[in-house]
Amino acid sequence: EMSASLVGSEMCIRDSCDIANGLGVRVTLFVSGCTNHCENCFQPQTWDFCYGKPFTSETEDELIRLLSPDYINGLTLLGGEPFEPKNQRALLPFLRRVRRELPQKTIWSFTGFTWEELHDPTAYSRCEVTDELLSLLDVLVDGRYVDALHDISLRFRGSSNQRIIDVPKTLQSGTLTLWDERANI
């Protein structure tokens, strides 16, 4: 298992394969650094932007290798917070590479920010690369984890306020479109 965080232009990450954070068998990239600090966060150690190890070209190559087998459905970004502005800037070149080299793989991301916050020009989470980063995703699970709304029956979410967004359909229609689990079984 690896770990990494974004430090300046570096990112520290942890990676592993799992089936709990998106459809199918996935490679999970844990991005360090988070200012949301949700109560009872399941990964509070990843709030630190320096947690884990630096994201290097060797790490990137290893993730591409891990993503390559046919039985791997795709990549999931977790945190920490992938949509911290400095994390967005560091993730963008890697996600471009995943799309270029492995176009058949899906990319999911979890964020404590809402879709609306990511599109609000005055919001902390929005930066010059947010739109392109979102355009590279298939699914975004948005919203802060709210302990009072925790529900173990929810698939791919920790609390009922979080939404599973079909990013391509949302961008194409201009209307927030939830991911249809039944259509993706």
Descriptions of predicted regions:
Residues 84, 148-149:
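Short glycine-rich, flexible loops that bind phosphorylated cofactors or substrates
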Residues 132-135, 158:
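Short, conserved loop/helix-junction motifs that constitute active-site signature segments
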